[in-house]
Amino acid sequence: MNQKNSNPKNPPRKISLLKQIDFYLVTDSGLSKKGTLSDVREAVDAGCKIVQYREKNKSTKEMIDEASEIKRICGDRAIFLVNDRIDVALAVDADGVHIGQDDMPIEIAKKLLGPEKIIGLTVHNVEEALEAERNGADYVGLGSIFDTSTKKDAGKGIGPASIKEVKNAIKIPVVAIGGINRENCIPVVENGADSFVAISAVVCSDDVKRETRKFIEIIREIKNSGRQ
């Protein structure tokens, strides 16, 4: 049985939000000017519907404390995912996790978290995207679309045309990641991305709310104009 059938068991509100996502916030305390909690608050206030807590420099206790506050900020307004750390996601009852190709297999993550939780998987090509969908991923993060310095092991950018190839191959949402900013985000959406991540462009700015809102406006304008 295709594990995608487990998707309808997810909370209706969260699955509804997953289908409506536009800009996708990934936190980075190392790059942030104002701090992770401030970034999340401003992005969600601007209309961001999905937040991934990505933290590599804090203790487990510190992460749980911070994740608990992020969950409170997101509330009913945004999906709250934890990057990699299933233990932290379980501790705070996050809406799900985002994992990579070398992390825990989706099937095991589903067993630990339960079928109602959302799982996103990083993929780099059509083959990995198809496998992710077969194994029950709720969405894929495709990249790196452009060269990026945010993630050291991201490799060379695969280009926005790769988004269309993956989008045509699977039915679950495709989130574009890697090196995306306001100068290059338009072809990302035009090639079919449901959403995209722009870490540096947002958390390094002086006004996270303004930058988030601008990205949301760009995405919605392209989608509403039929340019996808």
Swiss-Prot record:
GO terms for biological process: thiamine biosynthetic process; thiamine diphosphate biosynthetic process. It catalyses: 2-[(2R,5Z)-2-carboxy-4-methylthiazol-5(2H)-ylidene]ethyl phosphate + 4-amino-2-methyl-5-(diphosphooxymethyl)pyrimidine + 2 H(+) = thiamine phosphate + CO2 + diphosphate; 2-(2-carboxy-4-methylthiazol-5-yl)ethyl phosphate + 4-amino-2-methyl-5-(diphosphooxymethyl)pyrimidine + 2 H(+) = thiamine phosphate + CO2 + diphosphate; 4-methyl-5-(2-phosphooxyethyl)-thiazole + 4-amino-2-methyl-5-(diphosphooxymethyl)pyrimidine + H(+) = thiamine phosphate + diphosphate. Binds 1 Mg(2+) ion per subunit. One of its GO terms (molecular function) is thiamine-phosphate diphosphorylase activity. It comes from the Archaea. This is Thiamine-phosphate synthase. 2-[(2R,5Z)-2-carboxy-4-methylthiazol-5(2H)-ylidene]ethyl phosphate binds at residues 148-150, 179, 199-200. Its EC number is 2.5.1.3. Condenses 4-methyl-5-(beta-hydroxyethyl)thiazole monophosphate (THZ-P) and 2-methyl-4-amino-5-hydroxymethyl pyrimidine pyrophosphate (HMP-PP) to form thiamine monophosphate (TMP). Its cofactor is Mg(2+). Mg(2+) binds at residues 84, 103. Keywords: Magnesium, Metal-binding, Thiamine biosynthesis, Transferase. PANTHER family: THIAMINE BIOSYNTHETIC BIFUNCTIONAL ENZYME, THIAMINE-PHOSPHATE PYROPHOSPHORYLASE. It holds the Pfam family TMP-TENI.
